[in-house]
Amino acid sequence: LPASAPLVIAPNGPLVDQTDYTDPLALFVSGKNNRDSQTNLRELIQVIDAAAADSRISALILQLDRLSDSGMSKSAEFGEAIIRFKTSKKPVIAYADHFSQQRYFLAAHADEIYLNDLGGVMLTGIGLYRNYFKTALDKLTVKFHIFKVGTFKDFVEPFTRDDMSEASKQHNSEWVHELWG
C-alpha cells in the first residue's frame, strides 16, 4: 500500500450477514467457474471502520454498479459505516452507471456523487401493494368463517374486501413513513 491511496469499495451482489457455503466439488461438477456473488456486510463494515483509522487511506470511493438490492436494514448499517468514516475528515465519493433506490440511498452518504452521462436514477419510494379478491371470491361462492378481535387486524382483508380499510391505511402509512422518514 502506498503512503496515500483511496480505498475503493465495490460490493458485488446483495449484502448478506453470512455468505452461502459453496461446495467446491459441486462447483467443479456443475462447470461453473465461480459462485454467485455476495458481499458480507460485517466484513465490509470492518474494512471501512479500519480504513477510517488508517492514515494511508486518503478517501473512500464507493463503486456501486454491481450492488444488488439487499433491504433497508442492511443499507442503513452500510450507511452508518460511511458516516463513521466521514468523521475521519476524509472524502467519500460514490459512482454508478445507474442508481437504484438502494444505491442512491448509500450514495447520499457520500460527499460527492457521480453518475455516468448515459446513466439514470430510479427512485420509486416505499409502498405497499396488495391484491383484493372479494368480488372474485363472491363469484366463485367461496365462504369464509373469520374471527377477529380489534381494529388493526387486516390479514384477512384481501379476502373480505375490494379495497384497504381506513384502519389498515392508517397503520400501514405509519410504518411506511417511518421507513421513508
Where are these regions (language model features)?
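Small-residue-centered hinge/linker elements
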Residues: 1-181
